[in-house]
Regions:
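Short beta-strand/loop segment at the start of cytosolic alpha/beta domains
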Residues: 1-11
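Short acidic-hydrophobic, aromatic-tinged amphipathic segments that line or gate anion-handling sites
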Residues: 89-97
Length: 97
């Protein structure tokens, strides 16, 4: 997994699957939340997301008041987030390329 940030916009390439992926995502977003209350994340092609990442994103929205927008490129990940009733909480949109 690769992660990059420009301003309040984060791009994630590859599958989100390991503890190291979670740590990279958390570190990147922790730094951004010091300066921004709105963050957009493009998840280009991951087919899933670990529970630790989902829990962390939920904390950002529900506890820290971050306005999160999650743009997802893979239909399976959208279905997972829908099954977990997270589409509206994370403002999930289908990523158009």
């Amino acid at each position: 997994m690769e992660i990059s940030a420009r301003g309040n916009h984060v791009t994630i390439k590859g599958n989100i699957k390991s503890l190291q992926d979670y740590q990279k995502i958390k570190e990147t977003l922790d730094n951004l939340t010091k300066s921004y209350k709105q963050i957009t994340i493009d998840v280009l092609d991951s087919i899933s997301m670990t529970s630790s990442v989902i829990g962390y994103l939920n904390k950002l929205v529900m506890k820290d008041g971050i306005d999160l927008k999650l743009n997802v490129g893979n239909e399976k990940l959208i279905e997972l987030l829908e099954d977990l009733n997270l589409l509206s909480i994370f403002n999930v949109k289908r990523l158009v390329r």
